[in-house]
């Protein structure tokens, strides 16, 4: 574990493909254990919002990086929920608007922005007990994390989860289309040049296809608690 004063910090990395349940599980475990949950996707959304609010083109890498360098992105736990702050302002809702959602992929693909976010993610992980989820946390962002989990699940089960999630939000999309989208996303994530989706050699693989959220939370929590005792 990383040492902070007389205390030791725990780093938990959860990686895996889209809709494998990473964020849902990570949020619950972070809340239960009092860890900071670092939503790496929200960080790229924050960068996109910074560009938007400053009327900068989403492909202008240098301008966006200059703005991000002058900004602060923070996560705070408030009333059991994680809030995202940019320059002291709560932007938790602002980063989820259609405008930001439609353009975050372009911003997150910028090499210097990814490098900057990885730097910030490591900085955050050096100050708190953290649980972080993404595609390359255990391999790139936190290669020395005490606990590394790689969640997998069948395309069919992941598509069904996303389908139900969409239904709850009033979004209607054909299940077969969702399955296709996930297959395409899997290919892109595992073949991209910068930080591709890859299981770390020392990660514990957990198939969530036939597991409930509570069962996944229990299994990962047990792994973390065993590591804390060592």
From Swiss-Prot:
It comes from the Bacteria. GO terms for cellular component: cytosol. It is an enzyme of class 2 (transferase). It catalyses: CMP + ATP = CDP + ADP; dCMP + ATP = dCDP + ADP. It is found in: Cytoplasm. GO terms for molecular function: ATP binding; CMP kinase activity; dCMP kinase activity. Keywords: ATP-binding, Cytoplasm, Kinase, Nucleotide-binding, Transferase. ATP binds at residues 16-24. Its main location: cytoplasm. InterPro entries: Cytidylate_kin (IPR003136), Cytidylate_kinase_dom (IPR011994), P-loop_NTPase (IPR027417). Belongs to the cytidylate kinase family. Type 1 subfamily. HAMAP family: Cytidyl_kinase_type1 (MF_00238). This is Cytidylate kinase. It comes from Lactobacillus gasseri (strain ATCC 33323 / DSM 20243 / BCRC 14619 / CIP 102991 / JCM 1131 / KCTC 3163 / NCIMB 11718 / NCTC 13722 / AM63). The lineage of its organism: Bacteria, Bacillati, Bacillota, Bacilli, Lactobacillales. The gene is cmk.
């Amino acid at each position: 574990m990383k040492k902070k004063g007389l205390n030791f910090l725990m780093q938990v990395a959860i990686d895996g493909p889209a809709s494998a349940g990473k964020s849902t599980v990570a949020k619950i475990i972070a809340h239960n254990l009092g860890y900071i949950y670092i939503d790496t996707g929200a960080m790229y959304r924050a960068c996109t919002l910074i560009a938007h609010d400053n009327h900068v083109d989403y492909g202008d890498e240098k301008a966006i990086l200059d703005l991000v360098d002058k900004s602060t992105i923070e996560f705070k736990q408030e009333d059991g929920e994680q809030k995202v702050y940019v320059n002291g302002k709560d932007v938790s809702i602002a980063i989820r608007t259609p405008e930001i959602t439609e353009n975050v992929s372009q911003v997150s693909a910028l090499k210097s922005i990814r490098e900057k976010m990885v730097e910030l993610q490591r900085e955050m992980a050096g100050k708190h007990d953290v649980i972080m989820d993404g595609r390359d946390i255990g391999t790139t962002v936190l290669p020395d994390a005490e606990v590394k989990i790689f969640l997998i699940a069948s395309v069919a089960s992941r598509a069904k989860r996303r389908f139900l999630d969409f239904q709850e939000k009033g979004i209607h999309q054909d299940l077969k289309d969702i399955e296709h989208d996930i297959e395409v996303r899997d290919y892109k994530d595992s073949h991209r040049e910068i930080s591709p989706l890859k299981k770390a050699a020392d990660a514990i693989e957990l198939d969530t296809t036939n597991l409930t959220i509570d069962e996944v939370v229990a299994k990962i929590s047990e792994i973390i608690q065993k590591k804390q005792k060592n």
